[in-house]
From Swiss-Prot:
Name of the gene encoding the protein in the UniProt record: pyrD
Listed GO MF terms: dihydroorotate dehydrogenase (quinone) activity
Cellular compartment(s): Cell membrane
Organism classification: Bacteria, Pseudomonadati, Pseudomonadota, Gammaproteobacteria, Pasteurellales
Entry-linked SUPFAM superfamilies: FMN-linked oxidoreductases (SSF51395)
Source organism (scientific name): Actinobacillus pleuropneumoniae serotype 5b (strain L20)
Cofactor(s) the protein requires to work: FMN
Domain of life from the UniProt record: Bacteria
List of residues binding substrate: 62, 107-111, 168, 173, 242-243
Protein name, as recorded: Dihydroorotate dehydrogenase (quinone)
Length: 335
């Protein structure tokens, strides 16, 4: 079945196909039908009860338009966003490119979204009964020195409506954003956001976990430094990781020269290395959500065995369809 749908989608450019899929899932979410069952493979992470350990990675549903549709594919959790304080168009099109031979995708979207207020309204309307994470970022026009302002605005607005909040400082498509992963800049950001989280938990009488999303391009030394900051500021979880700037796995393939972050199957080895190194540094202090390159039960299990407690998928679903989600959710064994 999906082979026919894929043929139709792949006759379009990547972004048009994505937008078409979002609208189709938005419609499916409104219909009184179950597309696919929710596989039960429960796990508790960050004090939250997940029906299964397979989540939708941020970037798929930036505005939270199709939460119920994605929920009907069997995801145990859904992360929407990345969202910014105000709407922005992102980078010029075309900005999404398939690398067919490698089952990869390059994007340089640049946090295109309708703004945090629109996303919050969509989340409030959703009937999906799994865990919902909201991924927050900064507007492109905001100087990097003022990035904290944008993260605080978003955190305050989404806190009441999210089960957990992810702070995205690792997209390669927003100028200078990745500099927030290092040293004093990271410490200042985490210190301030942790303080804000504590204030909001008192205001709403409910503690919502705060998660950091990092890049797979960090060196071992940089990973150790990030891990130290995560522990010191009592951050609740970490997503490892985002897209990569490396082109080593796709050298010579069509579209490999395009600028942006590479995701999909070619990212698998790099993301597993990130998880493994991070797990050694954290030594169980906080959970890791594995993301990047998961394309089979074996590749997903490899990330669990490397130290991840949950997994997120997006690019591989474009190539393989929702059956992948069902297989992962049923067969992944969390340690």
């Amino acid at each position: 079945m999906y082979s026919l749908i894929r043929k139709c989608l792949f006759s379009m450019d990547a972004e048009t196909a994505h937008n078409f899929s979002i609208q189709a899932l938005k419609l499916a979410g409104k219909l009184p039908i179950n597309v696919l069952p929710m596989p039960l493979n429960p796990v508790e992470v960050m004090g939250l009860q997940f029906k299964n350990p397979i989540g939708l990675a941020a970037g798929a549903d930036k505005n939270g338009e199709a939460i119920d549709g994605f929920g009907k594919l069997g995801f145990g959790f859904i992360e929407v966003g990345t969202v910014t304080p105000v709407a922005q168009d992102g980078n010029p099109k075309p900005r999404q490119f398939r690398i067919l031979e490698a089952e990869g995708i390059i994007n340089r979207n640049g946090f295109n979204n309708l703004g945090v207020d629109v996303l919050v309204e969509n989340v409030k309307k959703a009937k999906y009964d799994g865990i919902i994470g909201i991924n927050i970022g900064k507007n492109a026009v905001t100087p990097i020195e003022r990035a904290l302002d944008d993260y605080q605005i978003c955190l305050r607005k989404v806190y009441e409506h999210a089960d957990y909040i992810t702070v995205n400082i690792s997209s390669p498509n927003t100028k200078n954003l990745r500099t927030l992963q290092y040293g004093e800049a990271l410490d200042d950001l985490l210190r301030s956001l942790k303080s804000e989280q504590e204030s909001l938990s008192q205001k709403f009488n409910r503690y919502k976990p705060l998660v950091l999303k990092i890049a797979p391009d960090l060196t071992d030394e940089e990973i150790a430094s990030v891990a130290d900051s995560l522990v010191r500021y009592k951050i609740d979880g970490v997503i490892a990781g985002n897209t990569t700037l490396s082109r080593d796995p796709v050298v010579g393939l069509k579209n490999a020269e395009q600028q942006g972050g590479l995701s999909g199957k070619p990212l698998n080895t790099l993301s597993t290395r990130l998880i493994s190194t991070l797990a050694k540094e954290l030594n169980g202090a906080l959970p890791i959500i594995g993301s990047g390159g998961i394309h089979s039960v074996a590749s997903g299990q490899e990330k669990i065995d490397a130290g991840a407690s949950l997994l997120q998928v997006y690019s591989a679903m474009i190539y393989q369809g929702p059956a992948l989600i069902q297989n992962l959710a049923k067969h992944i064994q969390v340690r």
